[in-house]
């Protein structure tokens, strides 16, 4: 059963040695990663909740790892989790769904329901310093009658509010590091800690102490003086 990821109604690029080619491509959504709410930098900084969506391009393949053979290229979009009428996420959801959502539909929309959905993506290349990025410029519905080849990559979703730690450990380390800083993931981990170590947990009974007196006086050993073979001189 899919977890729920609703975006409120109201207001990036990947670099590898081989990047997805320019042009319009058949695509399938195969990863939706909720990165949680973190502090953002830049002109529009502040705390924002982000979600990363990865698109598999089944007709565009290359050898990235000789041991795995040919694999499809992928493209990635990073969204602010918002279904405001002017948000990029809502615009792309409309494109994939092939219809305009009502305000009520947008408010209840489960972003994770996009997993496995097919569409067309238009990719452009953008230069930044000495690196070239493959960016998704537009997303459009799959044309009627067009069939998308079977998926190559397994579908994967991750929620910071209902985290599956098995899935979490499969994510790239830099993605894990982002998630660990999110408000939602921190709150979840704190709740888990409280459940395992409740505040009202009984305090263990302290171990009693045994103090050895060091201020021994010579008179304490008076009974040891004299003939110890005579039992009448023992203190008992």
Where are the language model's segments positioned?
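Short beta-rich binding modules
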Residues: 1-236
